[in-house]
Amino acid sequence: MRNVMKATTLESRFPLLAVEHGCIISKDADITAAFEVELPEVYTVTAEEYEGIHATWCKAIKVLPDYSVLHKQDWYVKEEYRPDWKKTGTGFLARSNGMHFNERPFLNHRCYLFLTKTTRERMRRQSNWSTLCRGHIIPKEIRDRETVLRFMEAVEQFARILNDSGHIRLRRLSDDELTGTEKETGIIGRYLALSPGNTDCLEDIAMSAEEMRVGSNRLCLHTLSDTEDLPAAVETDYRYERLSTDRSDCRLSFAAPLGLLLPCNHIYNQYVFVGNSDEELRRFEKSARNMQSLSRYSRQNAINCEWIEEYLNEAHSQGLKSVRAHFNVMAWSDDGEELKRIRNDMGSQLASMGCVPRHNTTDCPTLFWAGIPGNAADFPAEESFHTFIEQAACLFIGETNYRDSPSAFGIRMADRISGKPLHIDISDLPMKRGIITNRNKFVLGPSGSGKSFFMNHLVRQYYEQGTHVVLVDTGNSYQGLCEMIHRRTHGQDGIYFTYTEEKPISFNPFYTDDGVFDVEKKDSIKTLLLTLWKSENEPATKTESAELGSAVNAYILKIQQDSNIVPSFNTFYEYLRDVYRKEMEERYIKVEKSDFNIDNLLTTLRQYYRGGRYDFLLNSAENIDLLHKRFVVFEIDAVKDNAELFPVVTIIIMEAFINKMRRLKGVRKQLICEEAWKALSSANMASYLQYLYKTVRKYFGEAIVVTQEVDDIISSPIVKESIINNSDCKILLDQRKYMNRFDQIQSLLGLTEKEKSQILSINQSNDPSRRYKEVWIGLGGTHSAVYATEVSMHEYLAYTTEETEKMEVRGLAEKLGGDMEAAIRQVAERQKE
């Protein structure tokens, strides 16, 4: 069947001539430099930062020569997440996570910038002069070599201004990225097909009075092309109420409703036409005089004169540059009903900005044509309005999606808006970039905020990437995960130690595999003995610390010389009682009992010696081999209220970790202390804690303290000095419980107002269709964001701390011979039904 419609080939009307040296050259000899723009992540920018970004745009636009066009093009396209199974991992939970997010829809954002040098004649032309309906003549001016060189210098200066701002990054697009290759479609081809990815064939473009089509997609266009359509005032940003509270602000750019908050396929085009400002103002002066002379015939002329005078006064008094601007939102869909919904959504979003929604069908073809990368000079002049650079820049999109970290190492979290999985590195890349100086982390979250759930998620992923994990827990939070690892590794990892009367935890602090006792090992033994001897509020004197250190040194020397002596607390106690005390008595310079009371020391330590009530604790016959166990949990809930045992058990576990830390070279080590950190906060333990936190970074390790009580951290100066000040990564969960006293937390943790606003926005506007809780992660006081901890049902059942759910899974696992994975699968299937 023959096509009876009026038709022509794309080639005959195509406005572009060539792409050379990273520049697009049109058939009218306009030259365009193209960039990809990297904007700040959404919900992470403050009002002050938005003002800084706005000022940067204004400064950059001012360096462009006369008769230049800035065309900023933001693409928002619906895509589906596809996991990279090679990177996802082979573990049961890792693969279930990948399956959970497979085909998750999200709105992907790409931002491009096109800077075009054209001529005065081209900038004045209207839609009837579009290349859609005329031939091409190369103007003489653009053939001038000096004009081109000056423009390219201005482009370089423009890019340097934006890149130096610290908020925006520009990357020049190559020839292949513009035109495409055999395997990849270029940006020009993607625009003509309205497809963000590779396209195998070109689409027909149909233009009529009623609608415009690209392939099977019908376009819907809303324009801001007249000052009457604009709000009375524009700003750099606005308060986003859904994530704000009466104590905090969440800010978005003024044009954000036309960006990520508009959930459909669309392109937001932003144009600024830089002409000769002085010439424009002179033309306005002439127009004002004409209006003034005609004002006696029409009140409207008098009003127009007044408006023009106000515009001129503003320009001259503030030194502003007059430009023209245009903004349009172009959406598309192949479904007619969906397009109606999109049209309503676009109108609502424009209205929320204070704009008049103008659905433009007449100019859709010429505006689509002008939107071709490199063809901004073909824009119809009648579709633009006069304004100043400062006002035009307020309508630029200022934020983008959360980005994946380029690091190979990291954890998987989720985007706040769509739930798209994100790969973020909170350990290695921030260290390399100098954002943090250590990998230590401080985690604060009230009961029920998802703290243990998040920590399970974090340590599981660290473990699967080769980390040696040691956990000190007081609530069985990691039991399910530990048992799964134990089963999967056939007992090599997933070691779970718990304290019971029948089988108490026992250690031997004087044992080393190679018989080597370095300074750190000796200091840890001395600290342990001081903890056993002194009460929590009774600090040791210098003499007591020195004498105890000397006794430890002398005992170690003796066991190294005499292999018949079995290293243990029993033999140390005997050495202290029978040998060291006698040596003290024979010294020329006597030590007074008031300075070092060795009898008091022996009396206090006797309960840990043979026959004492705690003689099992420090005299283990077989050393616990933590060295090559990659996932070890110490569950010490049974002794957490025992004032004598709790500090001892905790410090010995810490000492065991330090041994692991020193001996495993080039291997990531991670120590997680839940509420057990309280045992380390006494005066005698302060130096030990400071040592651990300051030293662990040198051994490719990180210490993580997890707590839920604000009062604990506020009342403990040790925590502030040792833990918080040496933790460059801070992780906070839902703090609404403490909203009225958050100023204390803010002061203690040294949080900025920006970080405070982010933290108080946690869980304020969660999607009810998804099961997740949000968490704030701050790095070095300069980089921070809120992420969603969303997991699969299988992961949820492995991490859950709900008693009924744990009992259901564990009960079924026992029936299946201890197979936690099989039990989780069955319970998950039941819940789906």
Language-model features and meaning:
Residues 100, 516-571, 717-833:
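P-loop NTPase motor core of the ASCE superfamily
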Residues 133-161, 356, 445-450, 798-824:
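Short, cationic low-complexity segments
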